[in-house]
Each structure stands twice: as C-alpha cells, then as structure tokens.
A protein has these predicted regions:
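Primarily recognizes the serine-hydrolase "nucleophile elbow" in alpha/beta-hydrolase
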Residues: 117-193, 243
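Catalytic active-site module of serine/aspartate enzymes centered on a nucleophile-bearing elbow/loop
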Residues: 308-327
C-alpha cells in the first residue's frame, strides 16, 4: 500500500476492523434491519445523505447514530462498524449513519452545521419516516467522528441521551493540531497534496482513488503542521479563542451528556491526552463519564492487547444499551 495513503486509510477503517474482531453476532431469530437512504440536507446542488437501518414494525425504537472518521477530509457513511450494527439488530434499535460535507472544500463551521441539521432532521422526520424514538439517542463515532460525537453533546438541541467516542479529541486548536508530525510517513509534496482537493464539495469518498489522493492531502497537512488551519479555515495562533465554540473540551457544562471514551496510550495520530483532557473537564463539571484506557495501543487500538480490546468494545456496547434503556 502507498505509504502516503496508509495513515488516513487506517484512520477510516481501524475502528471497523477493531469491531469486527468481536465474537458477538446475529442469532437465528434476529431479523435483518431494513436499510433506506435519505437526503437530510441540500446545499446548492450538494445533497447530504444518511443511511437508516430500521427494524420492522411501527413501534418507536431508540436510535444509535454513527459519525464516521477520516480527519474531516475523507470517509463515508458506508463505513459502518459491524459490531454496533449487530447490537442494533439484536436490540431492535434504529441505526443512523451520517455523511457530512468534507474539508477542505468546506470548513469546520459548515461541518458542524451539517451535524446540527442532521439531528434537526432526525427529530423532525425520524418518528414518521422510520419510527425513531427521539427521546433516546446515543451518538457514536471514531477519530474525527469521535470529535464530532463529542461536539454533538455541546451543539445539538435537544441534547443526545449519551455519547460513545472512540479515540476522539476534544479540541481542534491545540498545539498537537498545529505541530509538524513525525508519525505520518513519506513526505507528500505540496503540489501533489493540493492537486487532490478543491475541485468540488464532497460528502464522502466512496471512490477509492479520491479517498487515496485526499489521504495524501491529510498527511501533508500533518507533516507541515497545517491540519487545524486546513480544516477550520481559522489560524488558532493568530486568532486565539475563535475556535473555542467548536472545541468540545471547552464547551462542557453540567448538562453535557454522559459519555464513554476509548483510547490507546500510544496513539500517534490522536494523542491519548485528548481523552484525558476531556475526562478532567467532565469531572470538573460533574458529568458522568468513563474513559477506557488501552495501554500500548495505537490509533484504532492497533497493537492493543486483544483481550483488553474485546473488553473495551463489549463495555461500549453495554453502555449504549444501558443509556437507551434508562429513559
């Protein structure tokens, strides 16, 4: 595999691969969920879509929302973690997987607006379109999707019931987002990186060639310390505080939703301290939370102890069940 793409490709698929290793599965009596695709937002000629997986019947059911990762630059709603989908099948939950407009053609404020609009659509249309019980919603996501999951707890109204963030981050303006990274492989030339983006607004990278090229763009941003500026359009050093409203760690209040976080201590893509910083602020505000730490695990829990990885994944599913049964 081309090393210029490898890191971001791993960012997008590591969660799915990690969750594929669990022994849980469908039973003989589990009926498959019914999949439909919906446009939840239109901006000009760009349609932003969501895939809905729902159980048969008209009874209102709780909702699990999945937000994909990919550095806010690549990824797709089609990247669905098997284990979470299996949970929804067994428990007869509605499962909702979101696309959103990708950077750098749009910036983080627009991406955040897509997340808000997705939940507005879910509350307004979900009950009649797919029998969603919008009083019970758990939001889940990995890496950049974990960031947007955390952000949803601060910007979505009404607030979700609970959140599950896999190796996410609570800030987008910290030094780690603006520093040159030594962990992203062979240097990607600027001209090559820029040639991969800027042609049109995308809501997913289902085209493998497109995803690969944009992966190179992400690697270039991390190698040069330009990632935060590239995806937000705001220079955090020149305009300190301007990104605060889009940094979940700076928006926690006592009514922030309960959250479970999973993170490896050797994560070289999203530092482990991103989750410990969140945990500290959550504790300060008295918010219920759990941080499951995987010693020695890389991004996506690569190199983590298989038993501990399985235990963490199982606890995440249990947390989802607990939260959706609580109301």
């Amino acid at each position: 595999m081309n090393l210029q793409f490898r890191s971001v490709w791993l960012c997008c698929v590591c969660l799915s691969l990690c969750l594929l290793t669990s022994s849980v599965g469908f039973s003989a009596t589990d009926k498959p969920l019914i999949k439909t695709t919906h446009v939840y937002k239109t901006v000009g000629d760009v349609k932003v879509e969501a895939d809905v997986y729902r159980p048969e019947g008209a009874e209102a059911r709780p909702v699990v929302v999945w937000i994909h990762g990919g550095a806010l630059i690549v990824g797709s709603r089609s990247q669905v973690p098997k284990q979470i989908l299996e949970l929804c099948t067994r428990e007869r939950f509605v499962f909702l997987s979101l696309d959103y407009r990708l950077a750098p053609e749009v910036k983080l404020p627009e991406i955040a607006a897509d997340v808000q609009d997705a939940f507005r659509w879910l509350h307004e249309q979900g009950p009649k379109l797919f029998a969603a019980d919008t009083r019970r919603i758990v939001v889940t996501g990995g890496s950049a999707g974990g960031f947007l999951t955390m952000l949803s707890g601060a910007i979505v109204t009404p607030k979700p019931t609970a959140l599950v963030a896999y190796w996410g981050y609570g800030d987008i303006d910290g030094e780690w987002t603006r520093s040159k990274s030594t962990h992203h492989g062979v240097p990607v030339p600027r001209d090559e990186a820029l040639a991969a983006v800027g042609k049109k607004v995308l809501t997913n990278t289902d085209d493998p060639a497109e995803g690969k090229a944009r992966g190179g763009y992400y690697r270039h941003l991390r190698q040069t310390g330009g990632w935060s500026l590239g995806v937000t359009g705001i220079d955090a050093e020149k305009e300190p505080g301007k990104l605060d409203r889009l940094c979940p760690v700076k928006q926690i209040t006592r009514d922030y939703p309960p959250i479970l976080m999973i993170h490896g201590t050797k994560d070289t893509d999203v530092p482990y301290f991103c989750s410990t910083d969140m945990a500290r602020e959550l504790t300060k505000h008295g918010v219920k939370h759990e941080l499951l730490t995987l010693e020695g695990a890389e991004h996506g829990l690569r190199d983590g102890d298989p038993k501990r990885v399985a235990e963490a994944n199982a606890r995440a599913l249990e947390f989802i069940r607990e939260q959706l049964a609580a109301k």
